[in-house]
Design a protein with these regions (language model features):
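Secretory-pathway luminal glycosyltransferase catalytic domains
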Residues: 2-126, 132-142
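Donor-binding and catalytic core of enzymes assembling or modifying cell-surface/extracellular glycoconjugates
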Residues: 124-215
Length: 219
């Protein structure tokens, strides 16, 4: 199965942007918090529970407990004991514009991906990835396009080749429900952060005493 058939595309994920909701970031976070709390389709999500239960901002202890709760409640899959879980923040970040790193920066960042990792110490390698497009109607940014989609898959194919060159299969974990991806990452015992703030949030909510690795930052 090709990567395009494995990786979910969230072409209009304008509301459920976990980092912005938690860190009160951007021009929409207040409106989107209100939408999370008022729209029934978000009622069973981690962010709904977080916004209902939090007594302070940036409450990672609460978030961690909700991740554990939702994983058990919905029987979400979790990684194996000796599985390396890699977060790839893809989607609108590969686009053009002042607020996006762009194709060249992201592609360069993932060159030499395995240079500082020993693939032989892991039985399995899983990349958690979806193409996320924030589609901000207030700024006109972060919208889906076929060109940006193609550039994303070019980068993913490059990472796949590097992974196969070190003798590992590129397993993909990708969901149209961000909660499932977050819960999978937070249960990893070996976790590679991406350059995104979501990766940092997840790293503060790890369920286990995990080894955390960091990829190179984009320039």
């Amino acid at each position: 199965m090709s990567l395009e058939n494995k990786v979910k595309i969230l072409s209009d994920n304008s509301v459920y942007r976990v980092t912005d909701l938690i860190h009160q970031r951007g021009v929409r976070w207040q409106r989107d918090r209100a939408e999370i709390l008022s729209n029934p389709k978000f009622k069973d999500t981690i962010m709904f529970d977080y916004l209902m239960e939090k007594e302070k901002e940036w409450d990672y202890d609460l978030l961690k407990s909700l991740i554990e709760k939702h994983t058990k409640k919905y029987n979400y899959p979790i990684p194996e004991e000796n599985e390396l879980v890699v977060h790839l923040r893809m989607g609108d970040v590969v686009g053009e514009g002042d607020s996006c790193p762009g194709f060249e920066a992201i592609n360069d960042m993932y060159k030499g991906f395995w240079d500082n990792l020993n693939p032989d110490q892991f039985n399995k390698v899983t990349f958690v990835v979806a193409l996320h497009f924030g589609a901000n109607d207030l700024t006109g940014q972060y919208y889906y396009s076929d060109k940006v989609k193609e550039d994303n898959f070019t980068i993913l194919e490059n990472i796949k080749k590097q992974t196969e060159d070190v003798g590992k299969e590129m397993n993909i974990y990708s969901s149209s429900e961000p909660d499932k991806d977050i819960c999978y990452m937070a249960h990893a015992r070996h976790y590679v952060k991406s350059m995104s703030e979501l990766s940092t949030i997840v790293s503060k909510c790890m369920v286990n005493d995990s080894d955390i690795y960091v990829t190179k930052s984009y320039k």
